[in-house]
Structures are given as structure tokens and as C-alpha cells.
Amino acid sequence: AGKEKQKTIWLLFILQAQSLFLTFLIGSFETGSYSNIIAFFEITLQDQQRLTNSYWQNNALFAVFNLISRQTHPSFPQFLASIDAVLIDRLSELALNTNFNTDSQVWIIDNAIYDLNTIYKYLPVWQPTITLALTDVLSTYPYLSEPYLWAVRGVTQNSDCVNLSIGQICLSTTKNSLKAVAFPNTYSFDDGIQVVYTPLSLASIQPLYHALKQVESQFFRLIEILAPVSGDPTDTISMYVYGSLRDYRVYHPFLFDMATNNGGIYIEKDKSFYTYQRTSAESIYTLEELLRHEYVHYLVGRFIIPGMWGQGPVYANERLTWFDEGIAEFLAGSTPKEIRPRKALVSQIQYDGSSRMNVSQIVTAHYGDFKFYRYAGNFFQYLYTYKKDVLRDLIRALRDSNIAAFDSLVTQMSQDMSLNTSYQSYLNSLVLNVNTLTNPVTVAPDLANLSTNDPAVIQPIFRTTSTGHLAKCTTAAFRMNGRFSCRGMITGSLRSSPDWIAAWSELNSGINNLISTLETNGVNNFGSMNCGMGEIYFNKSSNQFYPLALYSCEGPLAFQTPISYSRPTQDQLDFRDTTFGVNSTCFTNPNPTLGTICNSSIATISFPKTATYDEMYRFLNWQFNDLKSEVFMMRPPLYKRMNCGLNSITTVIPNQTTGDKYLTATSTCSL
């Protein structure tokens, strides 16, 4: 009977705990409830075994911890006034109860410390008492353990360092020590543009680096411009890859003040993204898929959308949520020659059955639910397959900061019932063939056995192809992961109209044929080559049109010791070695913080008298973008801070009789 009575009391406390949390959710708090919190903690401490393997009992305890942390705030003065030494003592007892220091129950200790930290923050009168309790925590648990880290957070809320009875504790020092444990290895790629911090081996990271190269090349084919947006500050990217999900959950909040209810996250203002190695039981996505996804976020911010993520009117009301996540999921399926639908996404749609999202729901999706990711990713795949011009227009609108044009396109898609019907049919076909789909798995080239480290060997072989017969090749990056870069113009067939979709498909196929031709060459560097493509321009010839665009290919080089470039001499040589920068002049800016300045005179072709200014400007702007792209792709590490503007645009009419005319302008790039 006594055991039954205890069981009844315990169940009553569980119900009370859940009731307490519900009262918080509806915004009320009864004074009598405070005593129930104390009593709940006391019975927990007296009968700890009842927490073992009990979902409801653990859930109730978590609810009480959650209630305390949320109610301990100036918005809830009644609860603040109720806090006394008894509550602090009970929380301290829970925090110092080493019986809970197991993988399954350490959360109890962590939450108790968290609540003490919260009270410390909002009720200074209790800071001395809580400091003593947290000092005991620091003495009780191992250095850098979960409880230790939470206690460091608590005692250093008012300053980086604090002197305690056990000695000085510093938040920054603890973070540095933890970083050394969490990320013992640092791998630098592309001469420092990409830096990976991780406990994983280099052999594990190399395939991921080469996977990102595939994503990048397809991204450039999609957006058509190979240079960063003006003034973009994200000239490097740091990748923090934790060794496990547990490390991510334990270390990440302490090191970077971020939540971990995600598979990874990119923070543009920090020029960093964070993720972790995972098992198939922990995630349906591989580490490679997550890195591919997050890297697309970096590329979008650097090459499409000006400004920082979340800032500016373009991000208002989560306008870009579907776009950001959709393009990332889509491009995560990149290979050197195509962008493939991913089995991981289509399988989830298969399991959704009839509860699919429609186009209108996709383009108005908000964060808070991951379901739209798979639908947005495959909607991009659909547009890429059947309506590539719409995809182009969406991207151009964002790059031009033309919110009205972007919104108009989204509204049209949202209201187009036939579009949704077609999209759903496309999903049906994907689901029907789901077992033929794959997820990306990249194999790194054998860097130790590459044929050459010299672009002078690469260039003549490249020039044996029809597309690459005028290519110019350079060393794009040095050291272990050296890279070559080869660039040139690719042209398409004469046609009766400037059909962009047909032209893109033709030029894209031409680039893939170039890759296929070279990848079987005896020089094995070409086996891992990736190629991008710039903006397509249509030249008119006898009332017909032929497309042309810049292409840029890059691939691995064997180890090469870095060389130091002489600036501005090298800059001027590089600018003059482009299609439209032959007359460039580079000089050192008198203001040393601005580095080198390169001015390039650009002139369009001659247009007839009837040509409009907009028509001439489109050609001029194409030349300008081509110049920026060609220089940037020569040596991305050298030109990572390149910022260019077009000025002094002038209309020239050399022959007043015919009225033929052209535009001239000066491209000014700070490096």
C-alpha cells in the first residue's frame, strides 16, 4: 500500500508539472504553483530511480526546468518575486548530483545549471550564492565536460574572466581549449579561401572539397556570372565540421551561442558554416549532402544577392525562404556534367503520399517545418528541366535587387494552376523512378599521382579541343590542392531568333563534350575538371543570331610551391590577358587600404542608328561582366576582394551620315 501511495503521489506531481507548464503557456502563474515546483524537485531527489526509462517522468521534469528558465524574466515579476533560497538549493542539489552524470541523464544537471545561470542573470541579489554553487560544479565535474561548460557560462556572465576560490576562470580561454579538442585539425584549401576545422582526417575531407567544386561549377552555369556581387565581404569561408552529433550538441552552443536543432547552418556575417559527421541512424542526409547544401547558401550570398542574409527589404516576410532552401537542395545534386534529382528528397515525397505541397504553398513557405525543403528542391529541379528561363529571370531579379520583378514572377507561379499540375506530374515521374535515383557520393582524385603541376602542360592539351582551341590557362591555387584554370569563349549555332533556352542547352552540351573529350586524356588532371559558364549574349549576323559566352574550367594540379605575385604588375598582366581588358592599366592606390586599382576602357561593337540605348547597354554590361568574371576565375585567391564598377558611359557617333554608334565606358576595379 505504501508503494502504491508513493506511486500515486509521483503521478500527481507529473500531472502538476505538466499543468504548471501549461499555465505558463497561457500566461498565468499561481503563487501556490511555486511550492509544487519545490516539492517536485524534492521528490525527484528522493526517488531518482523513477526517472529511469520513464518518458513521462522525464518529460515532466524537463517541463519544470523549462518553466523556470522562461518565467525567470522581467516579464514575469510574480514568479521572480517567488524565487528564494530553497529553489536555488534544490537546483544546486540537482546540478551537483553526480548520479545524473550519465549519457542519458546529464541533461538534468545541464538544465539545473542553466536555470541557475538564468536566475543569476535576472536577480543579482542571488549572484553570490549561485557563484558558490557553480564553483562547486566546476570542482566536481571533469574539465570541458557538459556541466563544466554550462558552469563557465554562468560565472562569466558579467566579464570574460572571474576569480573564484578554485582560481581564475575565463570564458575565452575555455573556448580556445574546447576548440582545440573539437577541431584538432585545420585544412586550408584554395590558398585560404576555404578553411575546414574538424577532428576528421584529411582523407575524409578531400572528397567533400571536390564535391563543393562540382556544386560551384553547376551554380555558375545556372547564374551565368562568375564574379562576386559588388562589395561582397565574404571572400573566405570557414567550415566547422564536428566529429559527431553529440559533439555538435554539446560543444556548438558553448562555442558559438547557436541552437543545434538542425543538420547544419551557414551564418553569412561570420563567413562560416557549421555541421557534423553523422551516422545513417542520426540523419537521412550524409555529411556530403549537408556540406553541399550549406555551400550553396554561401555561393548565393556571394554571387547573387547583395548585402548580408536577412538584411534589407528583399528578405522581408521570409520572401526568400523557399528560394534559399530550394536552390540549396537542388544544387546539392550537382555532378561535373549535370544536376541530378536526389533519392533522399524524392523518397520523402513518396512517403508523403497524398499530402504533398503545391506550388503556392512552396513559394510562401516559412521556416519552422522542414517539409518544404524537399518540395522546393524538386521545384527548382522542375524549373531547371522545363522552364529554365523562369529560373534565369528569378536569379537575375535577385542579382539586380529588383524585388518587384521577383515578386511578380513568384505571384505568377503561385497562381498558375497548370504549372502546379505539371509540377505534380513531374513529382509522380520522380516517385515512380525513385529506385533509379542516387545520392551524391564524390571520389577525390589521387592528388599524389596527378600527371602535372604546370598549367603550361594543361593549356596545349586543352587547345586540341574545338571548344578550347583559344583557351588560356593559369595556376588558380597552389599547395597540396593546387588548381588550374582555363578560360575562353564558347559559341553556338546560327539561329533565326535569340532563343536563350536553346542556346543555353547547346552551350551547356558543348562544355560537357569538352569535359568528356579531356577526361580520357593521358593527363589525369582532367579527370576531375569542372566547368562553369558566363552570361549568354546573342550576336546578330545577317538577320540571324549566334550565342556566345565565357566558359571557365578548373581542376587539380599536383603540389606546387606558392609564388608571390608582384602587384600591380601581375594585375595588369592578368587584366590585359582577357577578351575585353587588353587596354587595362593598373596602379597602386595612394590609399594603401584600397590596394590596387585597375581601369579598363571598354567599347561596344557598332550599332545601327535605330539601336536603342538599352540594346547597346546590354552588350556593354555583358562585356563588363565578362571582364570581371574572366579576371576573377584566373586566380580566385588573388582577386577574392575584387570590387568593380562601370562609369563614364558615353555614346559615340563617329559617322553622322549613317548614324552608326557605340558605347564606351571605363571599368574600375579595386583589388
Residue spans for each PLM region:
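Non-catalytic all-alpha helical scaffold/repeat segments
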Residues: 1-166, 363, 367, 435, ...
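Sec/Tat-exported extracytoplasmic proteins
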Residues: 216-223, 294-295, 299-307, 331-336, ...
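Solvent-exposed, acidic/flexible segments
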Residues: 201, 205-212, 281-292, 320-325, ...
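Active-site-proximal alpha-helical
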Residues: 327-335, 347-436
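Non-catalytic architectural context of zinc metalloproteases
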Residues: 86-238, 242-271, 359-373, 385, ...
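Beta/coil-rich, acidic/histidine-enriched accessory regions frequently appended to metallopeptidases
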Residues: 404-574, 581, 593
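Surface-exposed patches in mature extracellular/periplasmic domains of secreted proteins
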Residues: 220-236, 306-310, 341-344, 391-398
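Zinc-dependent metallopeptidase catalytic helix centered on the HExxH motif
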Residues: 269-346
